[in-house]
Amino acid sequence: MSDGGAPTVEFLRHGGRIAMAHRGFTSFRLPMNSMGAFQEAAKLGFRYIETDVRATRDGVAVILHDRRLAPGVGLSGAVDRLDWRDVRKAQLGAGQSIPTLEDLLTALPDMRVNIDIKAASAIEPTVNVIERCNAHNRVLIGSFSERRRRRALRLLTKRVASSAGTGALLAWLTARPLGSRAYAWRMMRDIDCVQLPSRLGGVPVITPARVRGFHAAGRQVHAWTVDEPDVMHTLLDMDVDGIITDRADLLRDVLIARGEWDGA
């Protein structure tokens, strides 16, 4: 396996494949993005998890994918129009409530957390938690929005790992002429890794040539969200640096079979 270039940020310094549990591991009974799911991933030996952060109306960074609360949690509405004192009462099922980002970083101090900032209102609350927990070395900031990602990086007082937003990735993937390719690399100058789907609309996105190209530029390549063992093997054979999965149990089995599991 290539090292994808020497990582300059602690988050990516691992020495092996990065196995990342997407919103934790449910064990087929726990809600995604719950503290129980994160703890299940830790029990499996995972050292990396991916999660989503939004903010309540009063500025508390919470672990939540969708803006609107799901039916059946005992509360309705958009999380950014509700205060934390109310959101904390929502029940996700299996005895789980909505955790805060600070809950997660505090409860699992050795876990590295890939944070997808889902809304502009969550930027400052996320930054404040990272600063308060001094968690710069164990978080990665990502977002589908380049504007959100870059604003978070500007507000943080220390360097953190970052993955490319959709705009930067599209610029790189569609660049053809030399001038366009130079622009694409400028778009990605402040990122440490790319996190890509293996396929998009049936078209391969991660290819051996692209993996080699990103490695040559010193960027790691992480594939998401991969739940099939045969696809995991194919991507690992392409030399991807990490895989993000809903099936942490299967990824663990695949890495064990390849002799590449070291507690993720």
UniProtKB/Swiss-Prot annotation:
GO terms under biological process: lipid metabolic process
UniProt EC number: 3.1.4.46
Domain (GP-PDE) ranges: 17-255
Keyword Nuclease recorded: no
Signal peptide: none
Chain residues that bind a divalent metal cation: E50, D52, H65
Catalytic activity: a sn-glycero-3-phosphodiester + H2O = an alcohol + sn-glycerol 3-phosphate + H(+)
Keywords attached to this entry: Hydrolase, Metal-binding
Active site residues according to the UniProt entry: H22 (proton acceptor), H65 (proton donor)
PROSITE patterns associated with the record: GP_PDE (PS51704)
One Pfam family matching this protein: GDPD
Gene Ontology terms, MF aspect: metal ion binding; phosphoric diester hydrolase activity
Cofactor list: a divalent metal cation
Family (UniProt): Belongs to the glycerophosphoryl diester phosphodiesterase family.
Physiological role: Glycerophosphodiester phosphodiesterase hydrolyzes glycerophosphodiesters into glycerol-3-phosphate (G3P) and the corresponding alcohol.
Record protein name field: Probable glycerophosphodiester phosphodiesterase 2
Originating species: Mycobacterium tuberculosis (strain ATCC 25618 / H37Rv)
Organism phylogeny: Bacteria, Bacillati, Actinomycetota, Actinomycetes, Mycobacteriales
